[in-house]
Amino acid sequence: QRDCYDELVQKKIREPDHFDWQKQARFYWMHDDERAQICVADVPFWYCNEYLGVKERLVITPLTDRCYVTLSQALGMSLGGAPAGPAGTGKTESVKDLAKGIGRQCVVFNCSDQLDYKMMGKLFSGV
């Protein structure tokens, strides 16, 4: 977060509608609804209160920043996203960290050639 503020100060961002400010995850308490709202770019999310434990957050790089904005836009349109890239570059961790930031559960499973429809059924039913 400190790096985010340093970047905003360095770029002399003063307007609340500037994209460099809008792309940051912003948390608001909505008094009328008595719950928290998170906004990323122009997409609002209700905080889902999913307890995820106390863990370290991911280090934010320009690439993870773009990933969050892109995935947030997709979620805002009721779509999904599938980050692509070489192994070990943080694709899964970026998705999990975004889910943690908005308080939603993120289930990760690996699709292999042994994954059949019975196992998928168990996964979707929560077994």
Question: What feature does the model see in each segment?
Answer:
Residues 64, 88-91, 113, 117:
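Active-site-proximal structural scaffolding
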Residues 73-110, 123-126:
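Walker A/P-loop
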Residues 115-127:
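Conserved alpha-helical scaffold flanking the Walker A/P-loop in AAA+ ATPase domains
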Residues 1-62, 66:
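Extended, charged/polar low-complexity intrinsically disordered regions
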Residues 57-60, 106-117:
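Flexible beta-alpha connector loops of hexameric P-loop NTPases
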Residues 61, 65-72, 78, 117:
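Active-site-proximal segments of catalytic enzyme domains
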Residues 30, 77, 119-120:
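Detector for methionine-enriched segments
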Residues 17-23, 42-47, 70, 75-79, ...:
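Short charge-dense sequence patches
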